């Protein structure tokens, strides 16, 4: 069972989009691969907040788990709407999907520092509904989901030396692909199509990154998130 919250962090601010960014709206928190930092994506204020993780904090002591980092946050372009963040398997790069602008931002990552190196479009129709982002286990390809219009997955190759993205394809999916996951062996990609009431199963070409629908849909009422148990 979960214990009561040991601490609560509150944020202030707003963003450029008056309908979607009237206040802070944390959409994802991610501990860095080195376990030393936590990044929190704030869709409402166009920021990635940074915290230092205290490894000595435990449920039975009074040590604070999170301490404000320096800088306290990283700002992205106004109206972007940062949603989900993921790290490359080598831990050297991070990638952010922006819900409102439909872009992916690539960062170099080193000991808590994010350095923006590229912005590339995942959504090219202005749907303002980009959703999830994941990298293949081999670190060669990145996938980003889009909803509301042209529902599907943008597919990018990742340059092995500098982490830069190149778009290599687009896979149309069922309606509202809110979340997806790549199987641990990298062979398949499962998409939670919320408004189609199915989890679609795609075979993944490990050489090209492209996807093939193998027509083995799993019927589920309003699927929104898929996780594998270690």
Annotate each predicted stretch with a short phrase.
Residues 25, 81, 129, 176, ...:
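Beta-rich catalytic cores
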Residues 1-3, 52-65, 107-114, 156-163, ...:
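Short loop/turn segments immediately following beta-strands, especially the blade-tip
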Residues 1-28:
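Asp-box/WD-like beta-propeller blade repeats and closely related beta-sheet repeat scaffolds
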Residues 33-34, 89-91, 137-138, 184-186, ...:
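Residue-level detector of Asp-centered blade-edge/turn motifs that repeat once per structural unit
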């Amino acid at each position: 069972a979960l214990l009561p919250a040991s601490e609560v962090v509150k944020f202030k601010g707003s963003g450029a989009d008056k309908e979607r960014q009237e206040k802070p709206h944390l959409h994802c928190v991610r501990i860095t691969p080195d376990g030393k930092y936590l990044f929190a994506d704030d869709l409402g204020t166009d920021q990635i907040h940074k915290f230092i993780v205290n490894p000595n904090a435990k449920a039975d002591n009074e040590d604070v788990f999170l301490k404000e980092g320096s800088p306290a946050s990283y700002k992205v372009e106004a109206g972007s709407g940062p949603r989900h963040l993921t790290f490359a398997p080598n831990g050297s790069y991070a990638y952010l999907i922006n819900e409102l602008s439909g872009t992916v931002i690539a960062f170099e990552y080193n000991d808590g520092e994010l350095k923006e190196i590229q912005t590339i479009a995942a959504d090219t129709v202005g749907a303002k509904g980009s959703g999830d982002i994941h990298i293949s286990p081999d670190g060669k390809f990145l996938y980003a989901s889009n909803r509301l219009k042209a529902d599907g997955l943008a597919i990018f190759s990742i340059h092995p030396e500098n982490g830069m993205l190149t778009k290599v394809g687009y896979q149309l999916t069922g309606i509202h692909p809110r979340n997806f996951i790549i199987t641990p062996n990298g062979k398949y990609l499962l998409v939670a199509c919320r408004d189609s009431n199915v989890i679609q199963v795609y075979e993944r070409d490990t050489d090209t990154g492209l996807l093939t629908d193998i027509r083995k849909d799993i019927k589920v009422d309003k699927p929104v998130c898929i996780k594998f148990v270690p």
